[in-house]
């Protein structure tokens, strides 16, 4: 898989809305037809389909030319969101002529990495329409730095290098501009949005906007073996799944990807992995293809799911944070993740399937398990497989600096991940 494809996704996916938009553009070029869940479906063998759910979640699937109800249902899921700062309504406030924007924290970012960085704004804006039940949606991306969170100088904060607690409401408020005395009472943020979108300020009804790092991905290292970028968690997985659903060669069954939102805040939303939509959607696919209720149930519960999200790599300055025998490094392939707590949904049979696929196709992989005295994180696999109880395996690219404003990966690991998911879909 070409690395340029990953770079393109990373550059475009500055919000979950833009991530889904970029994914749909990729799929449309490959012949995927868009469906709406509230309208009738007319499924055909040999076709490919996609469905946008509330703007930040995307489902896409292919129906094999030689489709059989008893062929294994193969699914893979990732997430479109990442930790960021979300702009609140009534965002404007002024501090001694500093124009500032009120924000809240989404997910679990490493907060100090967002200081002193040029930040853009991206997301969607809802605009007044003639039909009150169908307001207009406009995607917005500033495309340039419009915010910055300045650090307090060390002369005023002598203990900063010993570690200082960050107050989300005090320390994270970005600066948007310097105002004149006359401007201080104006509604400057909505005025800015209205001008950018060429709409009337009073027609802006609401918005869902987040900050993003405007710096682009960069190759790092003497031999450039590393890639530093915002949003590697989890757009590496999004890009791998898009590549695999397009390049998979399977002709006898259903291949499906789900790109969920809200993983970083627990998955429990209408567009998250805890939604019943994946289960209901798969049932509808099989019934649209003329399968009986019995055939549909058999297909659904005989399926398999790859839960694709990033893993922790061994940190060279903190080897003590990793398990003593299962500690992946950058550049040695993607990770198979497991935890007996089921924070990862992986089981031995699923690992057996995946390892055989990788061995047959000479794809590099590693094993990841947390230290026995560290709780570790979780991801969407355990949530999705609770609601849709199929065999599941958690996999992903190993990273350093996870949840930092910029994260770090080994460049060859994306190809390993994309190749593994493509083999699964072939």
Where are these regions (language model features)?
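N-terminal hydrophobic/helix-forming segments and targeting peptides
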Residues: 1-426
């Amino acid at each position: 898989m070409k690395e340029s494809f990953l770079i393109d996704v990373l550059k475009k996916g500055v919000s979950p809305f833009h991530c889904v938009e970029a994914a749909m553009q990729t799929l449309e070029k490959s012949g995927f037809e868009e469906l709406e869940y509230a309208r009738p479906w007319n499924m055909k063998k040999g076709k490919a389909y996609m469905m946008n759910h509330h703007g930040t979640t995307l489902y896409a699937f292919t129906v094999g030319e030689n489709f059989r109800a008893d062929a294994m249902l193969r699914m893979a899921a990732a997430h479109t969101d990442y930790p960021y700062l979300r702009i609140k309504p009534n965002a404007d406030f002024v501090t001694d002529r500093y124009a500032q924007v009120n924000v809240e924290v989404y997910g679990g970012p490493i907060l100090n990495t967002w200081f002193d960085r040029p930040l853009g704004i991206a997301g969607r804006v809802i605009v007044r329409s003639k039909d009150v039940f169908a307001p207009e949606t406009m995607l917005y991306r500033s495309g340039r730095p419009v915010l910055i969170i300045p650090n307090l100088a060390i002369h005023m904060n002598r203990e900063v290098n010993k570690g200082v607690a960050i107050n989300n409401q005090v320390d994270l408020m970005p600066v948007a501009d310097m105002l004149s005395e006359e401007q201080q009472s104006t509604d400057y943020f909505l005025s800015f949005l209205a001008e950018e979108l060429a709409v009337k300020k009073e027609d802006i009804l609401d918005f869902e906007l987040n900050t993003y790092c405007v710096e682009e991905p960069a190759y790092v290292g003497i031999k450039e073996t590393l890639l530093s970028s915002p949003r590697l968690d989890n757009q590496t997985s999004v890009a791998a799944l898009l590549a695999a659903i397009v390049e998979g060669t399977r002709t006898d069954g259903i291949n499906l990807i789900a790109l969920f939102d809200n993983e970083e805040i627990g998955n429990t939303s209408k567009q998250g992995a805890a939604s019943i939509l994946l289960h209901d959607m798969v049932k509808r696919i099989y019934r649209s293809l003329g399968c009986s209720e019995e055939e549909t149930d058999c297909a659904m519960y005989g399926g398999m799911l790859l839960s694709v999200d990033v893993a922790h790599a061994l940190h060279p300055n903190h080897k003590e944070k990793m398990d003593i025998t299962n500690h992946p490094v950058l550049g040695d392939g993607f990770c198979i993740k497991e935890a007996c707590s089921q924070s990862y949904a992986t089981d031995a049979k699923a690992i057996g399937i995946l390892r055989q696929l990788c061995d047959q196709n000479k794809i590099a992989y590693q094993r990841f398990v947390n230290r026995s005295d560290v709780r570790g994180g979780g991801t969407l696999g355990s949530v999705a497989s609770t609601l849709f109880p199929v065999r599941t395996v958690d996999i992903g690219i190993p990273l350093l600096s996870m949840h930092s404003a910029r994260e770090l990966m080994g460049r060859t690991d994306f190809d390993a991940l994309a190749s593994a998911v493509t083999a699964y879909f072939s």
